[in-house]
Design a protein with these regions (language model features):
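Solenoid-like repeat scaffolds
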Residues: 25, 308-312
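Contiguous, well-ordered alpha-helical segments that form the cores/surfaces of helical PPI scaffolds
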Residues: 174-182, 194-203, 226-230, 259, ...
């Protein structure tokens, strides 16, 4: 298999790997896709000899982040020996910026916000609400506990529930997003990041090979954090409101997409314009979430095989989105505002297979003079 040969070298040829992965990473080889995605996301170096050491260093760094950032204020027993000023600053009612309690309250707000979204992640599947240790969770009592955990904020759980807490896949998402937000105060956490992380998590875990040191269980969470962080470097501008009108912001991205549509799908474009449908109304989440909410998890993963290979990330996404509109062109032509919005919002339902969407995208690239090298999807 050529793609396996491509990563079994001391130094990986990134251009070759991108070309091979563009047409889809084979599902038949367990653990292959997570390795390929890590390389494409710069989570693994092109120098394969450095992988083991890099994974271990990232693991240790992430463990430090967890210890330092996921904390609760602790009342000191030797308060009598503490300085009076520090005691005042650490009072629960203190709002001093240096106060441990002030930090705790802000962190709790952030924690609760992320928890609320994480519990809604991928509502079309229950995977993220399952216990990490599936073998430990088989009894009716365990299932009842899991349901109670899901329906109750972690901060509001009773002591008995906390003591017997069953950690779920959603808890891993929660932790990673919280640490990311703490380390990136300029971006913080924005709704939708949970869905992006969920695709990475599902891919890495479900295609896991515990015997492989590169994709084994030990490094899963830390590796997810760093690969998610790398992906967000390229997506973050779309989540920043202050950059909305910049070229790299979400409005800039959507403007580029609309300009392509105007050239290659003029009838659909003019219908949308005539009905004064703001392109943001229907395409905002396409760009922010790399279309992962439009398709099933399996379809999203196949689509991301291609999107992650784009050296001009994520310019290719513009063409995919125009291709998506082409599938509903006949439905919206001569339609009114409501017709346009309804069909554009469910455009994915008109796509038979992801391969059909990508082949249409390739046709649009050629029509728009964005040539790729043999990027026809089989």
């Amino acid at each position: 298999m050529r793609i396996i040969e491509a990563i079994n070298k001391e130094t990986i040829d990134l251009k070759q790997l991108r070309k091979l992965a563009f047409t889809g990473v084979p599902d038949s080889c367990l653990g292959l896709r997570p390795v390929v995605w890590r390389i494409l996301l710069d989570g693994l170096s092109l120098e394969t000899k450095s992988w083991r050491n890099s994974l271990e260093q990232n693991y240790l760094s992430y463990e430090d982040f967890k210890r330092e950032l996921i904390v609760k204020p602790k009342v000191k027993q030797d308060a009598a020996d503490a300085e009076q000023q520090k005691a005042k600053m650490d009072h629960p009612l203190s709002r001093a910026t240096e106060s441990v309690w002030n930090t705790y309250f802000k962190d709790q707000e952030l924690w609760d916000e992320i928890e609320k979204d994480v519990k809604r992640t991928r509502s079309d599947m229950n995977f993220f609400y399952l216990a990490l240790d599936a073998e430990r969770c088989k009894s009716a009592a365990d299932l009842t506990r899991l349901n109670r955990q899901h329906d109750t904020k972690k901060a509001d759980l009773k002591p008995a529930d906390i003591e017997g807490y069953l950690e779920t896949h959603a808890d891993v998402l929660h932790r990673i997003l919280f640490i990311y937000a703490k380390l990136n105060p300029g971006v913080k956490y924005v709704q939708g990041m949970n869905e992006v992380l969920a695709v990475l998590y599902f891919c890495f875990l479900k295609d896991d090979d515990a015997s492989n040191p590169v994709v084994g269980h030990k490094y899963l969470e830390s590796d997810l954090f760093f690969n998610f962080s790398n992906l967000m470097i390229e997506l973050r501008d779309g989540f920043l409101r202050e950059l909305d009108k910049e070229k790299s912001g979400i409005q800039g991205r959507i403007k580029q997409y609309a300009e392509i549509m105007k050239v290659v799908e003029p009838h659909a474009y003019h219908t949308i314009e005539q009905n004064q449908v703001n392109h943001q109304f229907y395409s905002l989440r396409w760009f922010m979430l790399l279309l992962c909410q439009e398709f099933t998890m399996a379809q999203s993963i196949r689509l991301w095989d291609t999107l992650l290979t784009d050296p001009q990330r994520f310019q290719f996404t513009n063409f995919v989105c125009v291709a998506l509109v082409s599938f509903v062109r006949d439905e919206i032509i001569d339609g009114d505002f409501a017709c346009c919005m309804e069909n554009l919002q469910k455009a994915h339902e008109f796509v038979p297979e992801i391969s059909d969407l990508l082949n249409k995208t390739n046709e649009i690239c050629v029509a728009y003079n964005r040539h790729e090298e043999s990027y026809t999807i089989g």
